[in-house]
Amino acid sequence: SITNEQILDAIADMSVMQVVELIEAMEEKFGVSAAAAV
């Protein structure tokens, strides 16, 4: 299985737009919103 460090390394290599798309994809997959709590 993949480690948190491997996930962070992969995200670090992505552009801002790719990260935004990743977050949207995760929201769809898990049926959640990644909006930060204030």
From Swiss-Prot:
Descriptive protein name: Large ribosomal subunit protein bL12
Taxonomic placement: Bacteria, Pseudomonadati, Pseudomonadota, Gammaproteobacteria, Vibrionales
Residue ranges the record marks as coiled coil: none
Family, similarity comment: Belongs to the bacterial ribosomal protein bL12 family.
GO CC annotation, single: ribosome
Function in brief: Forms part of the ribosomal stalk which helps the ribosome interact with GTP-bound translation factors. Is thus essential for accurate translation.
UniProt subunit comment: Homodimer. Part of the ribosomal stalk of the 50S ribosomal subunit. Forms a multimeric L10(L12)X complex, where L10 forms an elongated spine to which 2 to 4 L12 dimers bind in a sequential fashion. Binds GTP-bound translation factors.
Top-level taxon: Bacteria
Transmembrane parts of this sequence: none
